Amino acid sequence: MSARRHIGNPEYLTRRIPQNPRYQHVKSRLDTGNSMTKYIEKLEEIKKNYRYKKDELFKRLKVTTFAQLVIQVASLSDQTLEVTAEEIQRLEDNDSATSEADAEIAAKTNGKGSPEEQSPSPVQFINSTGAGDSSRSTLQSVISGVGELDVDKGLVKKEEPNGKDKPYPDCPFLLLDVRDRDSYQQCHIVGAYSYPIATLSRTMNPYSNDILEYKNAHGKIIILYDEDERLASQAATTMCERGFENLFMLSGGLKVLAQKFPEGLVTGSLPASCQQALPFGSVRKRRGPKMPALPAENKWRFTPEDLKKIECYLEEDQGPADNPSRLNQNNSAGKDSKVAACRGGQNLPTSCPASHSSPRTLTSGHLQGKPWK
């Protein structure tokens, strides 16, 4: 008696569905919690953007951590500048008040005991041997002479650089760009110093004064970066072998920085290797002629607009996908925004015909009334 054959073929259960590369970038809507898909995507991202090696001597600094550090340093520096400006203004006001009081006293007494006597000229002080030739009058002539010589000095004054054009004072980190000089002039992070990796090969003075000042200093760190960790990892390993203990490498370099913070942190035009490519199958928009690459500015501090952009990208990056505990916060924020939107829409006319309601809402309400359907 032959064995009983089952209906269907068991191979159908193991057969894979062919994937269309055109829709490879489309993700499913329902993707919550930890899954194998997310784990594989994370591994692929690490292989693509990072170059982890075993037994790394240096420490790594995430791009998001660096952005938070930049925001804190900029806010503290602005507060310090405001306090310093207030103190300088107060001292200037005190000096002007004292000088006005001295001028009034001198005008009343003419520099002597009686207000009626006329003050002799400086020439009389020096040449005459009369009553005006006293210790006080001679001192006054010297003072007036110095003042006459300093009249022309006030016209020619060297323009002092603005405080905002200089690096942050007492900055806790020293940012070094280890690419070549041309790449640095094309694009770099705001506040970074150019330190090509070839400088480490010098036999005499391979380090600048800033690097020696920050080397193993308490409360200060040195950060190296490049485009894709190729040069920065070599430079960081060499410097750690030479005794640098407070050295960090910006994990991912400019490539990851451009993905997470397209604006705000960088000045100049990003290289082509760091720019994001459009996914396969996506519609490319027609653009005009390509704009020429703008060189990087000599910029040492972040503007308020830059800091706003950095904060926006930080909030966007720190979503519920990274931290599940933030899911409830985002839901509550979404509810608050909906409530605010509803309050804002109270001014609109309330009488809406029933025909304007979408069929989706009607069917959803119908199903809520009958859960078994």
UniProtKB/Swiss-Prot annotation:
It comes from the Eukaryota. Residues 91-137, 317-373 are annotated as: Disordered. Keywords: Cell projection, Ciliopathy, Cilium, Cilium biogenesis/degradation, Cytoplasm, Cytoskeleton, Methylation, Phosphoprotein, Protein transport, Transport. Pfam families: Rhodanese. The modification Omega-N-methylarginine is found at R343. Disruption phenotype: At 10-13 dpc, embryos show a range of phenotypes, such as malformed hindbrain, exencephaly, brain hemorrhage, dilated pericardial sac and lethality. For an unclear reason, some homozygous mutants develop normally, suggesting presence of extragenic phenotypic modifiers. The modification Phosphoserine is found at S96, S99, S114, S121. Its main location: cytoplasm. The modification Phosphothreonine is found at T109. SUPFAM superfamilies: Rhodanese/Cell cycle control phosphatase. Residues 116-137, 325-334, 347-366 have a biased composition (Polar residues). It is found in: Cytoplasm, Cytoskeleton, Microtubule organizing center, Centrosome; Cell projection, Cilium; Cytoplasm, Cytoskeleton, Cilium basal body. Residues 169-266 form the Rhodanese domain. Coiled coil: none annotated. GO terms for biological process: cilium assembly; protein polyglutamylation; protein transport. One of its GO terms (cellular component) is cytoplasm. Found in a complex with TTLL6. Belongs to the CEP41 family. Required during ciliogenesis for tubulin glutamylation in cilium. Probably acts by participating in the transport of TTLL6, a tubulin polyglutamylase, between the basal body and the cilium. This is Centrosomal protein of 41 kDa. It comes from Mus musculus.
